[in-house]
Every structure is written in structure tokens, then in C-alpha cells.
Amino acid sequence: MTKKRKRQDDFQKVKLKVGKKKPKLENATATNFKTKAIHLPEQLKEDRTLPTNNRKLNIKDLLSQMHHYSGGVKQSALLGLKDLLSQYPFIIDAHLSNILSEVTAVFTDRDANVRLAAVQLLQFLAPKIRTEHISPFFPLVSAHLSSAMTHITEGIQEDSLKVLDILLEHYPALITGRSSILLKNFVELISHQQLSKGLVNRDRSQSWILSVNPNRRVTSQQWRLKVLARLSKFLQALADGSSRLRESEGLQEQKETPHATSNSIFINWKDHANDQQQIQVYENGGSQPNVSSQFRLRCLGTLGTVDEDLSSPENLKGFIEIIIPLLIECWIEALPPQLAASVGSGVEREPLQVMQQVLNVISLLWKLSKQQDETHTLESWLRKNYLTDFKHHFMSHFPYALKEITKQRKKDTNKSIKHCTVLSNNVDHLLLNLTLSDIMVSLANASTLQNDSSWIETIRKFVTETLKGGTRLNSKQLNRLLGVSWRLIQMQPNRDATENLIKAVYTLYQQRGLLLPVRTLLIKFFSKIYQKEELRSYRLRYRSKVLSRWLAGLPLQLSYLGSRNPELSTQLIDIIHTAASQANKDLLKNLQAAALRIYDPQEGAVVVLPAESQQRLVQLLYFLPTLPADLLSQLSRCCIMGRLGSSLAVTLIGILYMRSSFSGWSHSVNDCLMTDVDYLSFLFSTLTGFSKEELTWLQNLRGVPHVVQTSLSPVLLYLTDLDQFLHHWDITEAVCHSLLVIPARSQSFDIMQSAISKHLVGLTVIPDSTAGCIFGVMCKLLDHTCVVNEALLPFLASCCYSLLYFLLTLEKGDAEHLKKRDKLWEVCVSILALLPRVLRLMLQSLRVNRASPEELPVVGQLLRLLLQHVPLRSHMLTNAILVQQIIKNITTLKSGSVQEQWLTDLHYCFSVYISGHPQGPSILNALY
């Protein structure tokens, strides 16, 4: 075949037959495989680009869109910023400057949706930005806010109040620092200045008049209500910040108590004696002096940049001159003279709200004036300029009530009634009347009482009726009410009128179910009245019967209140302590009657309240008229149960000693204050550390880990917890001190050993702390004049061996009981050294033939330690024959086995300290 023919064969078309499958090509790709998706949740390699939101826009993209001409784009950018910052909060700190500058710039945007998105974003950002972080940028924020408040567009002004609400909530100190500008803005929001030539020479109070803008979406009255509500919040933040500043500078305490020191030094003499507390004698003598002064450093800026805020009386007076006439106009607009005749039937909701905000602003201005008016010059100036206007406009129709108006519709009438009722409940006409009363009585004093008697009597009648009306008052209403009552009591010399007012307050105090803030305010009010009466001289002192009745009922209230309200209980205790220290007879009588409930060891206030209140209650024991046996029994239980701290229990024991006849003080009031028998019974009960019932329950314990049992002693040892042991040991030292100061040492020793013989001898289970404390007291009381009861010696010997056996069998891993070893070893050795008969009886009880094989090494170790101890060496030498016999019996029992190391050591010690002594036994051949 020619080459041309072969070339044609390469391009021949294959003819396919119908019904036959197409043959597969040689280079065909196989498609019969399966695939699975691979999910990558994150990239291992970090992307250096900025995080993006759902629209893949980062922070720079979103901030750049804030400059777009379209309002929709800017709104979308603000919403995207909120979405991005909620997903990546760390961006806020990194781009805070740019975020604030762009967001605040749209406060004055002409698009309402953009402004709404900006307010929502600011509401989201404010809780996440701390004050110290936003502080450098706050002048910019304040400038944009001021621009929005003074903008000519009504919608921008309305939205600026929303921004102000956010800043007042989260940054009150920063926003009130710009008060010089913002206060002017508030004035301009509701008024405008007259610029006519005839008014140039007028004062600034007459150059401002209320403005009316018909283009607003709300009425002028509703707009003023919004502005006045924000102004009230702003002044409240300003007043709170001013009071905190004055308290930090120490001015508040100096004003109330001029002779008191602002800084007190609390000294713990135990810590000072151990060089654990350093005392700085001079207040400003440390490395960092803290000087409290009434003077402030003046600003070094130029005179033209002085901040005209309300921190000085002159600036405050200037603002009052501008705002008070405007507030009076708002009042007249809300309550026109032509409608004044119908005020008796009540004022509608919206005008009443305006009146409430007017009074709130005036009240806060009065509060600011009191903080700065140290010479009472502002008070007289306010009375001179505004008392006449206030009486004419405010007091002419006092008190005011709410007029309920129910708007009914043809459809859904019930829903309309419900909606109207909810709105009406937001208006507190009682608080309005109380605020007005507070403002008015602050303008009066005792010297002007005769001139102001008419309207003061009206306020007094209203206050008395409100207190006796039985209405449930909240803390805000009651605070105003008690403030007015206190002012009336201060300026009123008439005792009958004062008594009626106090009686009205007491009527409110007797209501059940009062909330904690309400009850606290009432207690503080009565306490203030009582302290005021006590400060007077005895001749001029007037004791109110109602106040005496209230004071006498406090102990019973405290006994029932307990721990249900610790704060209220603390306030009651402070008042009771003050009255008891001043020997108020009625209170002391009722305190005596309620003492068993107050000092109950299970549920009494003395064990359930915090430590500070417990200390005050313990101190009250010094003022109780009598201390009967049942009360002393409860006090003993309080000491030993551990519900009182060891130091407080020691204080209690010391107070009872001062009340006893052994203190050497003469008791002229009542010789039967506390009998000696009851006092000594209290000391012994506290010394044992356990009640009779608890000791009886312990006798049934056998075979438990807390009980140490030995075959050579009839007394079993109950192991107490370490905390209980240390607490018992601390109060035992106080009991020892109380017994040591009794002049007749031998008599107190006889009483103690008689009590031990009666209540402890015969018990088979004794707590380790009780045995150790008994030994400690006997060692300290024992002297040459004391005679030990023979029947007591076997019990002491058995307890001593049980304690020593417990100490010698302690394991190194038992860290809790190892801390008891030194204290118990010391008292055991001391009792054996002071009472040789106890040592002899203990040695006689060591019948090793009855001991278990595990106990023999313990007996041998005990004998070796007793031989090595120097204070006991002479007594061991006296009992050498007895010791020799015990060692012989031990050696006999161990003769069948290889001699152990402990037995070799025992033989060596015996040969050194007994056999080697000149007075020792001469023949020991049977043993060696």
C-alpha cells in the first residue's frame, strides 16, 4: 500500500451501526468515581487583612462609607459597624478614635434613619468602652452633642436628647464636666433670648422667654417635658459628682463634726507588741502624705477660658437667675390661672408631669446650693428673691392631685382603659407634693417661722395626714417625707406639734411588711431625733413619749429579726448600744427581757449575725441590769460552740469578770447583779468546752476513729477537730486569767476540783481538749496552799496516760493532730511534776501483763521519755522500784523473742538515770 493510501486510512470515518454500542476510545476518561467535600473551618495561615462582616467589608471600608452623600449608604455602614464590632470586639480599642469621630459626626445628619442608627450604635458601644478609654475623645463627643442640641432642625434636637441619655447613663462624670456648655444648651432648647434694644439694660433673668415652635411633631408642653426630664437627670449627676468629690476631700466630715479627725488609726496591741503593726503617729508623716484641705489649686489657663460651670456660688446663682423664671413660666403654662379653680378635682397627667419636672429641677438646684453655701448666704438670697413667687404660684392650690381621664373608644374599650391607667400610674402626685414641701421648708427657719406660719401649717397638715393615711410609700417618697418632717421638727419650738409629727411617723413605722429601704429610712430618722435630744443639756432635754416607746421596742424587734435582715439588725444594734450606754431605763428593761432570745446559742442574733454585729452585742452585756444563771448558761454555750470567734469569746469572758464581784468594783445599783456561784459555774462550763448533753452522748461512742482506746487506762480519749481544739484552748486561757485574779486562790482551786469530781470523774470518754484544759487550769491554780482531793487523783492519772498514749501513737501523716502535741505534752508533764501522786498512780496502772503486744513499745517509749525529762527525774528516782518492776515485767514478756531497739534504749536510760544515780537501787542483778 502506497504512502498516500495509508494517509487516507488515518482520516477514514468509522461507520456506526444502529443498535450497536459506540466503542470506547482508547484515550477515554473514566468517570465512574465518587467525590467527598472537604470543609476548612479556618486557615492555618493567618490573614493579615482586617476582619470583615457578613458583607465582606472591614472597618476601613465601613468608616469610609460614612462620608457618602447617600443616607442609605451611611445607615448601612452604621449597621455594618455594629455587626462587625459585635463579632470582633477587639477592633473597638484599636480603632476607637476613628469610630468615635465618624459616629459622632452624624449626630447632626439630616437623615433621621442615619441618626437613629448612630444612636443605636452608641448604645451598643457605651457599655464596652471604659471611662478612662473614652476620656481623651470626650471633648469631641461633647462638641458634636452640643451642635446637635443647638441645631435648627427639630428632629436633630430630639435625637440629641437620646444621645445625652446614653452619655448620662455610662459617663456621668465626663458629661457633667462639660456643664458650662450643656446647661446653656438646655436653656436654648426651651427658650430664646430677647435681643430688642429696650431689653439691653435688663438683667439676664428677663432676657429669656419660653419659645414655641409649631413645626415640631410634639406639642410645646411635651417638648419642654422631655427637656426638663433630661435637665433633671443632668443636675442629679452633677449633684452626685459634687458630693463624691467633697467626701473624697474630707470636707463632708469636717462640716458635720468640726472637731473630729478625718482619719482614724486602729491599733491591735497584740500585733504591735509582736512588731507586726507599724503606727504612723502623724497623719502626713508617711512617704506619701495625704493632705485634706478645703483649698483647691486654681487653673493656670487664661482668664478667657474659665469654665462657667456650677462649681462656684456665683455661677450657680447666675444659672438660677436664668432658669427659675423659665420654670415658673412652664408651671403657669401647665396650670393656667383660669384653670386653677378646678384644681381641687385634680390635674391631668401631662401637666402634672411638667410640674413634677419643674420641682425636680428646683430641688436639685437647692441641693447644689446647700453643698456650696457654707455661710448660708445663698439660702437667704434664694428666700429673698423667690419665696414670694413660689408662694403665689406653687402654694396657692397645694396639695395637688391627679385627675384620672379614661378615653373610651367604640372598639376595644377595655384595652383603652388599661392603657390610660398604665400611663396615669407613671405620675406620682404624692412625690410632687412632697418635693414642693421640701423646697418650701428649705426656705424657712426658726427666725422666720412667724412670717411663714400660714403655709408651713399647710405643709405640716399635709405631712401628718400622709403619714397617718396608711398608704404604702416607696423609699423615694419616704425620703422626701422624712426630710420635710425633720426640717419641720428642727424649726418648730412647739413641743405638741413636734410630738404629733413624731407620732405620725411612728404610725407609719408600725405598718407590717415594709420594704427594707423604707424601714431603714424610718430607723435612721428616729435615731437622728434621739441623738439630737441627747446632745441637749439635761435641763433643756425633752423626752418624747413616742420616741421612748419606739426605743423601748427595739430589743424585741432585734430578737425576732435576727439574720433575716443583717443590715437592719446592725442598725438596731447601733441604736440600742447608744441608748444603753446612756442608761436609758426603758430600753435596758426591755433588753433584759429579750436577752435570752438575743443570746440564744442556736438561733440568737449573737451567733447568726456578722462579726461586727456580734462584737456590739457582746459589748451590750456590760450594760445589762442583771446576769441571771440561765443567761450565763447560754453565754457559756456561745463561747464553746465556736459560733463566736476566739477573740470575741475572750472579750465576753472579760466583760463578765468586770461585772462580777471579784473585779473589785463597787456595784451601787444592784448588789445581786450576778452571784458568785453563777459566775464560777459559767467559768467551769466554759472550761469543759462541752455541755452535759454532749458529754453524755460521747459515753456511747466505741470503735470509731475519733476515739482512742487503750487497755491500760479506763478513760477513752475523744479527738476533737483542730479548730475546735484551738478555740477551746484560747478561751481556757481567759478562764484561767479570771480564776487567777480571784483573791482566795485555794478556794477557787477547791471549787474547780469539786466541779471536776462531780461532773467529769466517772466518765469513760473525755475529749482531748477538755482533759488538756483541765490540766492547764490546775497547774496554774495550784500552789502551796491548795490541797488536792484524793478521789480526783486516779482520774487525773488515767487522763494523763490516755493523753500521753495518744501523743506517742500519732503518725507523721496526721498533720491536724500533730499540731496539738506540744500543748498537750506540756500540760501533761506539768501536772506530773506538780502532783507526784498522779505520776505514781499512773505508773501503778501500767500493768503490762494486761497490755497488748502493740502497746508494749508505747509503754517503753513513755518510760524512757519520763526518765529523760529533767523536771520529772527526781520523781522517777523516788519511784525507782516501781519503774524497775515495770521494766522487768516488760523484759519477761519479750524474753522469748529477739530484744528490740526500743527495749535496749529503755534499759540504757534506766541504767544511766536510775542505776547510775547515788540514790538509786543498789541491786539490779535480777534484771541484768
Swiss-Prot record:
Q: Name the family.
A: Belongs to the IPI1/TEX10 family.
Which stretches are HEAT repeats? 99-137
**Predominant cellular place of this UniProt entry's protein:** nucleus
Job of this protein: Functions as a component of the Five Friends of Methylated CHTOP (5FMC) complex; the 5FMC complex is recruited to ZNF148 by methylated CHTOP, leading to desumoylation of ZNF148 and subsequent transactivation of ZNF148 target genes. Component of the PELP1 complex involved in the nucleolar steps of 28S rRNA maturation and the subsequent nucleoplasmic transit of the pre-60S ribosomal subunit.
**Subcellular location, in the record's words?**
Nucleus, Nucleolus; Nucleus, Nucleoplasm; Cytoplasm
The protein's UniProt keywords, in alphabetical order, are: Cytoplasm, Nucleus, Phosphoprotein
For the keyword Calcium, the answer is no
- Provide the protein name: Testis-expressed protein 10
Q: Name one GO cellular component term.
A: mitochondrion
Phosphothreonine is carried by which residues?
29
Domain of life, per UniProt, equals Eukaryota
Task: Fetch the PANTHER family from UniProt.
Answer: REGULATOR OF MICROTUBULE DYNAMICS PROTEIN, TESTIS-EXPRESSED PROTEIN 10
